């Protein structure tokens, strides 16, 4: 009986320690993603295609009310020529395997360069760990406002 109790305790400690490690690793990944999110609009505002480096080679962007944009050329085309804006992302949930891929659920608020609110909404991004670091693999977003009627 004593052996069973000891084994059960060791087993519980093993699971608990593993959960702590994963939790800690996810927090580290979240810090990396938050840093990337803080500079997102800087890259889109450059209008020079540098935003594409934030995505995996086989990434897809899923904008609202439009076809998916897959690959560097289409993603660059989507962002190029867009308005100068500032976007703040607030991560609500982050889950997955901190060694390979995680999913980010965030809210965003978009303002013009003078701070006037233009839009707000939600984002789901699947981040993939690459040899160059964490990159966006799938990026889907939509605003929080009803569709405008014709």
Report the location of each language-model feature.
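Short, low-complexity N-terminal intrinsically disordered segments enriched in polar/charged residues
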Residues: 17-54, 147-150
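Structured segments of extracytoplasmic/periplasmic soluble domains
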Residues: 39-47, 54, 58, 78-82, ...
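Hydrophobic pocket/interface hotspot
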Residues: 40, 51-52, 59, 71, ...
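A short gly/proline-enriched turn/hairpin at secondary-structure junctions
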Residues: 58-69, 80-84
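Short beta-strand edge/turn micro-motifs at domain boundaries
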Residues: 122-147
